[in-house]
Amino acid sequence: MVMLDTLANALATIQNAEMRAKSEALIWPASKLIINVLRVMQREGYIGEFEYIDDGRWGKIKVQLLGRINKTGVIKPRFPVKLRDLERMPHWLRKYLPAYNIGILILSTPHGVLSHKEAIAKKTGGVLLAYVY
C-alpha cells in the first residue's frame, strides 16, 4: 500500500477510531510532523497521552482518545495564511470550522506547529495543515 499523505492517513485513523468509540488508536508510519500535530491536539484537549513505538522500520504512535473529536482532516492544498487573515476569519477559512469559537486550525509556522489561537497570540502566520473540532 502506497501512502501519499501520512498526515491525512493519521488523522483519518484517529477519526475512525473515535467514531468506533475506541479508547486508543495506532498510527503508522510515524513522522515528526504527525508528532507535532498530535502535541497541538493534546495541548488543546482533543486527545490524551501518546507514545512513539520504535519498531525498527517506520515507527508507530499509540494515541489515547478522549472522545472529544467530531471531525478532523487535512487542508489541501496547503496554502499560506497571514496573521491578518487569522484574526478576521474570512469566509474561505470558515468552511473548515463549524463556528467562530469551535475547533482549531493547525498551522506550520516559523515558531513550529501551532493552533490558530497560539499563532494569533504569537503574532505569526503560517501554512494551514489541518483542522479539528
From Swiss-Prot:
Choose any GO biological process term that the UniProt entry carries and state it: translation
In this UniProt entry, which cysteines form S-S bonds? none
Single GO MF descriptor: structural constituent of ribosome
Q: Keywords assigned by UniProt?
A: Ribonucleoprotein, Ribosomal protein, RNA-binding, rRNA-binding
List the InterPro entries: Ribosomal_uS8, Ribosomal_uS8_CS, Ribosomal_uS8_sf
Name one cellular component (GO) term.
ribonucleoprotein complex
Q: Is Glycoprotein given among the entry's keywords?
A: no
What Pfam families does its record include?
Ribosomal_S8
Q: Which PROSITE patterns match?
A: RIBOSOMAL_S8
Tell me the superkingdom of the source: Archaea
Question: NCBIfam families attached here?
Answer: PRK04034.1 (NF003115)
Q: Which family does it belong to?
A: Belongs to the universal ribosomal protein uS8 family.
* Role: One of the primary rRNA binding proteins, it binds directly to 16S rRNA central domain where it helps coordinate assembly of the platform of the 30S subunit.
The record's note on quaternary structure and interaction partners says: Part of the 30S ribosomal subunit.
Report the protein name in the record.
Small ribosomal subunit protein uS8
What organism is this sequence from? Staphylothermus marinus (strain ATCC 43588 / DSM 3639 / JCM 9404 / F1)
Q: What is the lineage of its organism?
A: Archaea, Thermoproteota, Thermoprotei, Desulfurococcales, Desulfurococcaceae
